[in-house]
Every structure is written in C-alpha cells, then in structure tokens.
From Swiss-Prot:
Its EC number is 2.7.-.-. One of its GO terms (molecular function) is ATP binding. This is Probable protein kinase UbiB. Keywords: ATP-binding, Cell inner membrane, Cell membrane, Kinase, Membrane, Nucleotide-binding, Transferase, Transmembrane, Transmembrane helix, Ubiquinone biosynthesis. It comes from Shewanella loihica (strain ATCC BAA-1088 / PV-4). It is found in: Cell inner membrane. CDD domains: UbiB.
Length: 549
C-alpha cells in the first residue's frame, strides 16, 4: 500500500468514525479485534450523535467525495437491502463537484483529438456547461457545418482515483461481511462488486457513445424518444462529441405547464417507453433520473422525451423477460403460487426452496396492496417487495433485475409527478398481454425457429455422426453394465460359498468342543474339530478377493 493510499484509507476511517457509522453495527457483531481497532483511534469520536443513521451515512459519503456519492446513489436504489428511510436519505446525494481548470480540459480534449481544438471546432466555450464527478461538458460548434455540439471529457486521473477508492471499498466490504456473516442478506461484497461494474462502465465514454447510437437507432422513427446524434469520428475512451439539444428538464413541471405540455400523454409515453425498451428491444436506459431526461419544447400537445447519458444500460435474457412479464400478470391475478413457481423456475431462488412457505411469504407481502385501487399500485414497489421477500429465501442478486427495478421506480415516480392520476396497470397491461401472446403464439414460435435456424443448419451435417456416436456409446454402456453385472453375480456366488463353508466349519468346531467336554469318544470330537478347521480354511481361501465391481 502506497503512502497516498494509506492517507486516503485514514481519511475514510476518520470520516466513518466521526459520523459514528461504526455505532450502526450491533455490539454482538463486533469481535474483540474490531473493538481493539476502534479503541486505537480513541481521539476520533462521533460528532453527529443527534442525527439518525441514514442521515449520518449520507453526510459521510458526501464528505468522502464523488466515488462515494455515486455509490450512495446506487445504494439508494437497492431498496431490497435498505429501509425506505435510509434509501430516501441517500437519494438526496447530488453528484455535483466544482469544474476543473479549462486549460486542463483543453489539453485533455486535444490529446484525444491529436490536434488543436480549433482544427475541428469553433466557439469552444471554456466555461463548462456542466460538471460532475466523472466528467465535464463544454459547448462548441463544428467547423465543418456549424452544428452546435457538446464535448464530454473525463476528469484528469479520474480512473486512478476511482480504482483506489474501489479497492478500499472492496476491502471494507470483505471485513464487514466477515463481521455480519456470509449468510447476512446485506451481502456487502456483492453490492460493491455490482457498483464496480457500473462505475467502470462510466469511465469508458466510447462505450457510452456506442450505447447512445444503438438506443437512437431503436427509436429513430419514434415520436416518443429522441437520443442526440453522436459524432463517431470524435468519440474516444476519454472524449465524446454529440449534438447539442434544447429542452425542458422533466422535473420542471411549472415550465412544462407554462408551455402547454400534454402531461397525461407525456406520463403515459414514459411507461410505454420503458416497456418497449425492456420487452421489444431488450436494451433499456438504466440511469433515467430527472437530470438525464428532458422534454421537447416544440409541439407541446404531442411531446417527446430527450434522453442523455447512456453510460449505464441494461439487458435481460429472453427467459428473464418472460418470467418478469408472467410475474406482473400473476401478481395482478393474485396468483401467488405461480409467482413462487416462477422465481424457482427462473433460477432466481434455489430449486429446493420450500414452495409453500415461499408462497405464503409472498401472499403476506402482496395481498395488503390490493386494499388500494389498482391505479394506485406501484409496479416498482411490487417488484421491490417481491425481491425483498425472495432475499429472505436466499435469492441470488441479479444485477440486470436491480437495474430494471431502479429504472422502473424512476419511471413511475416521474410519471406520477407529471400526471398524478396515471394508471400504470391500464397503460402496461395491454403491452404485457400482447407481448406474452406474441411470444407464445405462432408468430413467436416462427421467430424463435428463424433465430435458431442458422445454428441448426450448421449442425445438421454433424447429425448422423452424433446419432452414430450416441448409439455406440449406448451400446458400450449396456455392454459394460452387463460385464459389471456378471462380475457382481460371480462375486456373490463366491461370497455365498465362502459364508456356507465358514458357518459349517463353526458348527462342526462347536460340536467337537461339546463332545470333548462331555467325555465322549475322542475320535468323534477330534474328527468334528479337524473337519471344521479344514472347512474354515477352504471357506477363508474361497472368499472374494476384491469386493469392488
């Protein structure tokens, strides 16, 4: 460990102790060496005893900086692990940091371009349009055609800082997991690994550009979502250039009302967009918080969304999609047995899970939800409560489902903020039923056959050989089983013969001993003992030498 990393480790420990985060661990889970370590930092005391645990954690992450802020934001979406109070506190964390020097930004951009900025751009604005923990955004115009663009560039040395903090997080999570026990539902090491995957994806701007291009192509003819154009010739690992857009932040309801936006249509389109991305395209924007979503200013009566920041995207397997759709339909049909079966069939929980107990646990959680009208039931909270219940039955964390749950909660919150009367079930049910019918119907079967056709065409020439090999293998297996059976029967015959001789010898020896003790004729007693001894020797020599068959 370098001096620099040791200094950072001390800073983290200092912050943790001054915010009393160690006090949140139950005393029974603190072994003697943990208490000794805590005592060795006796001068660092809890300065925030008046604050609740969730607030202390939020403030500590805020003080530790950008990597921990983003980690806190990610944790706020893990409501299957945290209580609602803690999750809401962490959701308040803001990824806002002071901009870095524009001269450094220029140098970073020119290093990626391999030329001065003025070679390709005019009107480069040294004052950043926005600044976050990972990157910074500047505006300019393309020299070739005068189009307005934004340049997004990574912060200097951000990769080194992120990886150093991730290493500390991983080590801390391993210690915490040891204290809590590996069976604890929090599974800190698993959570940190999930975060590592997310944030490392954000460090590659080229990947973000490719994601944006794919999402843009998926909705190129859509009147519901617009993704800004990426200029691929200027997209690199540490720099991307995209079309500049103008819109109203989706969280600014007053501005949307002022321009006469059809909020009901906008809210319904948000739900439709989510299900289209998940079920039609299997490629969904997984970071749809209000800062990344804008609304068009043109045609407010027929509004569309503008999506930014495609660094975090989610995908599901075909199996996951089918189970998810069936889950929602089973929930609204109150078929809790089917929900439990789906979790087991999908492999999300172990096959040996007690189905009856699992079904009862799901029913206890879900049934009270139906005390509310259907239009007030939250899809996101349904999924969340099901995940929480499944975690009690050792559900393995599915990162793709965590992203989906987070996105669904964002979309629902957004939709109800725009239009409180939004009925998600009525909006989503036709889509889900149509998708399920398509998957199970002739068209769905034809698509699956078409998808698998190239594979089977490639394998077809090998089929006769595979059939022959399997038949030969089966024949050899039968022959080997027959040989084993013959060996087994012969060994059993030997064993029976040996046992017969040994038992007979024992009887004769006993009889000879009795005759001898009764002063009977000596030759009779000696004969019994002698024959018995001979039979014992024959029986011993005829026993099976190797009992393995």
């Amino acid at each position: 460990m370098t001096i620099k990393s040791m200094r950072r480790a001390y800073q983290v420990v200092k912050t943790v102790l001054q915010y009393g985060l160690d006090d949140l661990i139950p005393a029974k889970l603190k072994p003697w060496y943990f208490r000794l370590l805590r005592w060795s930092f006796f001068w660092l005391t809890n300065q925030h005893k008046d604050k609740v645990g969730g607030e202390r954690l939020k403030l500590a992450m805020q003080e530790l900086g950008p990597v921990y802020i983003k980690f806190g934001q990610m944790l706020s979406t893990r409501r299957d692990l945290l209580s609602d109070e803690w999750a809401e506190e962490l959701a308040m964390l803001q990824d806002r940091v002071p901009p870095f020097d524009s001269a450094i930004a220029r140098a970073q951009i020119e290093a990626e371009l391999g030329a001065p900025i003025e070679t390709y751009f005019d009107n480069f604005d040294d004052t950043p349009l926005a600044s976050a923990s990972i990157s910074q955004v500047h505006t300019a115009t393309l020299k070739s055609n005068g189009e307005e663009v934004v340049l997004k560039v990574l912060r200097p040395n951000v990769e080194e800082k992120v990886h150093a903090d991730l290493l500390l997080m991983t080590q801390s999570a391993q210690v915490l997991e040891t204290l809590l026990g590996h069976g604890n539902r929090l599974r800190p090491a698993e959570v940190v690994e999930d975060y590592r995957t997310t944030i490392e994806g954000e460090l590659n701007l080229k990947l973000e550009a490719l994601n944006a291009i794919k999402l843009r192509n998926n909705f190129i003819d859509s009147g519901a979502l617009y993704i800004p154009k990426m200029y691929e010739e200027f997209c690199f690992t540490r720099l991307i250039v995209m079309e500049r857009i103008y819109g109203v932040p989706v969280s600014d309801r007053a501005a949307l009302e002022a321009q006469g936006t059809n909020l009901k249509l906008l809210a319904e389109r948000g739900v439709e967009l989510f299900f289209t991305q998940v079920f039609r395209d299997n490629f969904f924007h997984a970071d749809m918080h209000p800062g990344n979503i804008f609304v068009s200013t043109e045609h407010p009566e027929d509004p569309f969304y503008i999506g930014l920041d495609c660094g975090i995207m989610g995908t599901l397997t075909e199996q996951d999609k089918r189970y998810l759709a069936e889950n929602f339909l089973a929930f609204f049909n109150r078929d809790y047995t089917r929900i439990a079966q789906l979790y087991i069939e999908s492999g999300w929980v172990a096959a040996d899970t007690d189905l009856v107990a699992f079904e009862q646990a799901i029913k206890v959680v879900c049934e009270p939800m139906f005390n509310k009208p259907l239009d007030e039931i939250s899809f996101g909270h349904v999924l969340l409560e099901l995940f929480r219940t499944a975690r009690r039955f050792d559900m393995v964390v599915q990162p793709q489902l965590v992203l989906l749950e987070k996105t669904l909660l964002y979309i629902e919150g957004l939709g109800r903020q725009l239009y409180p009367q939004l009925d998600l079930w009525q909006t989503a049910k036709p889509f889900l039923e149509s998708w399920m019918a398509e998957q199970m119907g002739p068209l769905g079967m034809a698509k699956k056959i078409k998808k698998q056709f190239p594979y089977w065409t490639d394998k077809l020439p090998e089929l006769p050989e595979l059939v022959y090999d399997n038949l030969k293998m089966g024949k050899n297996f039968v022959n080997s089983q027959n040989q084993l059976l013959d060996r087994y029967l012969k060994q059993q015959q030997k064993a029976h013969k040996s046992n017969y001789l040994l038992i007979t010898s024992a009887v004769l020896v006993i009889c000879g001993s009795i005759l001898f003790s009764q002063n009977a004729t000596l030759w009779a007693s000696y004969a019994c003992i002698g024959i018995g001894a001979t039979l014992w020797l024959l029986g011993w020599r005829s026993r099976p030498k190797n009992r393995k068959f």
